[in-house]
Curated annotation (Swiss-Prot):
Functional note: Catalyzes the transfer of a dimethylallyl group onto the adenine at position 37 in tRNAs that read codons beginning with uridine, leading to the formation of N6-(dimethylallyl)adenosine (i(6)A).
Protein name: tRNA dimethylallyltransferase 1
Subunit structure: Monomer.
Residues binding ATP, per UniProt: G9, P10, T11, G12, V13, G14, K15, T16
Site (Interaction with substrate tRNA): S100, R122
The organism's place on the tree of life at top rank: Bacteria
Keyword list, A-Z: ATP-binding, Magnesium, Nucleotide-binding, Transferase, tRNA processing
Species, as recorded: Bacteroides thetaiotaomicron (strain ATCC 29148 / DSM 2079 / JCM 5827 / CCUG 10774 / NCTC 10582 / VPI-5482 / E50)
Chain intervals for the UniProt region annotation (Interaction with substrate tRNA): 34-37
Gene label: miaA1
Residues binding substrate, per UniProt: T11, G12, V13, G14, K15, T16
Gene3D superfamilies found in the cross-reference section: 1.10.20.140, P-loop containing nucleotide triphosphate hydrolases
GO MF term set: ATP binding; tRNA dimethylallyltransferase activity
C-alpha cells in the first residue's frame, strides 16, 4: 500500500538531514509542509533546502510562490494531494516533512470545505483591519460567531480576519463550515516525530540563528523590505530585523529576539504535535530505531541497517 512517511518536529530539531537520508534510501521524493519555504524570496531565514540538498533529493512545494501570492492551507491541501497522487504512481513511499502544523494536518486530516473568499470581501476586511484595528474586529467576531470567538487565537489577525470574511460573504458563521471530520486518504500515513531535550534544542536554535546571520540573513531581509506589510513576512527572523532596519532596535538585540521567538515557536509546535497520539517520537540520532520501526510497518524495499 502506498505509504506517506510524515517527519515532523519543532524548528531546529534536525528534520532536514534525516528526511534527506530517508528519501535517498527509499529512492523517493520529499514534499515540504513548511508554509514559509514556499516563497522563493525566503531562503536563509526559512532554512530552505540548499541547492546541494535539492540535487540530492527532488523536493516539491519549495520556492514555488512569490511574496505577493495569496496562499491558504486549503490551497496547500489541494496542490500537495495532486503531487502525492502523481508521486505514488512512481514510488511506494513518499516523505512529507515540515513544521507548519496546519499544513501537516491538511494532509493527514484534511481541511474543512470552507468557501473561497472573493477579492472584494478580502479587500474590505483588510481595510477594516488597517482602519479599526484587531480589537474592533475581535468584537465583531464575538457578535457574529461567538462559538469561534471562544476558541480562536484572538492575537492572530489572519485567523480573525478570515473568519469575518466568511461571515460577511456567506451570512453564516465560520463555525458552521468547520466539520472537523477526518478525510480518508488513499495511502497509509506513518508519523515520525523528532524531539530533543529542551536545553539541547535551544542550543541548536541559537547556533542556527547565528549561522543564518553569517550566511546573509540581514541582506535577505533588506531585499524584501518593501513587502514587509505582507502576512508572509510576519515571520520570525524577518520581523525582528525589520525593527533593526527601522532603527528601533540595535542589531545584537534583534538577533537575541530572533533566538527567543524561535524558542517560543518551538514550544508552540511541540504543544500542537503532542496532542497527536499517532506520532512515534525519536531522537534524531536514533536512526537505527527509526528504521526498525519502519521495518515493523511491513514496508518493502527498506534499506539495510548497515547502509542507513
Amino acid at each position: 500500500m502506498p505509504t506517506l512517511i510524515v517527519l515532523i518536529g519543532p524548528t531546529g530539531v534536525g528534520k532536514t538531514e534525516l528526511s534527506l537520508r530517508l528519501a535517498e534510501n527509499f529512492h523517493t521524493s520529499i514534499v515540504s509542509a513548511d508554509s514559509r519555504q514556499l516563497y522563493a524570496e525566503l531562503k536563509i531565514g526559512t532554512a530552505a533546502p540548499t541547492p546541494d540538498q535539492l540535487k540530492r533529493v527532488p523536493h516539491y512545494l519549495v520556492g514555488t510562490l512569490h511574496l505577493t501570492d495569496y496562499y491558504s492551507a486549503a490551497q496547500y491541501e489541494q496542490e500537495a494531494m495532486e503531487i502525492l497522487h502523481q508521486l505514488f504512481t512512481e514510488h511506494e513511499v513518499v516523505v512529507l516533512t515540515g513544521g507548519s502544523m496546519m499544513y501537516v494536518d491538511a494532509i493527514c486530516k484534511g481541511i474543512d470545505d470552507i468557501p473561497t473568499v472573493d477579492a472584494e470581501t478580502r479587500q474590505v476586511m483588510l481595510q477594516k483591519y488597517e482602519e479599526e484595528g484587531l480589537e474592533q474586529l475581535c468584537a465583531e467576531l464575538r457578535l457574529l460567531d461567538p462559538d469561534y470567538y471562544r476558541i480562536v487565537d484572538l492575537k492572530n489577525p489572519k485567523r480573525v480576519i478570515h473568519a469575518l470574511e466568511i461571515c460577511y460573504m456567506t451570512g453564516k458563521t465560520y463555525t458552521s463550515f468547520r466539520t472537523q471530520q477526518k478525510k480518508e486518504r488513499p495511502f497509509r500515513i506513518l508519523k515520525i516525530g523528532l524531539t530533543r531535550d529542551r536545553e539541547e534544542l535551544y542550543d541548536r536554535i541559537n547556533r542556527r540563528v547565528d549561522q543564518m546571520m553569517e550566511e546573509g540573513l540581514l541582506d535577505e531581509v533588506r531585499s524584501v523590505l518593501s513587502y514587509r506589510h505582507l502576512n508572509s513576512l510576519n515571520t520570525v527572523g524577518y520581523k525582528e530585523l525589520f525593527k533593526y532596519l527601522d532603527g528601533e532596535w540595535e542589531l545584537p538585540f534583534a538577533i537575541e529576539k530572533i533566538k527567543q521567538n524561535s524558542r517560543i515557536y518551538s514550544r508552540k509546535q511541540m504543544t500542537w504535535f503532542k496532542r497527536d497520539e499517532e506520532i512515534r517520537w525519536f531522537h534524531p540520532e536514533q536512526e537505527t530505531e527509526i528504521l526498525e520501526y519502519l521495518r515493523l510497518q511491513n514496508l518493502t524495499h527498506l534499506p539495510s541497517l548497515d547502509t542507513f
